Amino acid sequence: MHTNLRTFLKQLEEYGKAHDAQEPEHSRKLLNLEADTAELVSILAQSACAKRALEIGTSNGYSTIWLAASIGPSGGRVISIERSREKQTMARENPAKAGLLEYLDLRLGDATGVIRTLPGPFDFVFFDADRSSAPDQLDLLLPKLSSRALVLADNALSHPEQIAGYITMVNGLEHFQHVIVPVGKGLSVAFATLT
């Protein structure tokens, strides 16, 4: 990743922290990934040679930029879903400033509804939104996963009660290896071997 992009991401990271510290309404907070988590998500996407990634929860595009920079130049594409129009506006502006908009397909709407309309296959999925809806969304995505897909979810340690249904579901899936990595707020990493 080139220096200018790292500088821009650092600015977004700092803006996100300052914004969230002042914003009293939870739904208006940006809730960006921690830098270490974003770096790990990027490394995993590159290592998987992901070509078709799905991000659930775009926010202002911070993690979306990490994903697009990781897989876009090698032919990958990121579909990212956000339900807040205000956040999606930022999510369109920020990747454009980073020169990565061409690798993105930004969708506005309820993620569960949007997922129903999306064709597969996906070889990389990143859940970073409403944790209580994640099990239903994963259920919709299972038939749309590639045979060796990576499925990630943030907040696995910071919000254990809210993400418990998702973690239980992933742990119960045959042909999935799963681990929670203690980085940032906890990153759930599941590898599907659906041969």
Label every model-predicted segment.
Residues 1-124, 131-152, 156-195:
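A short alpha-helical cap/connector motif
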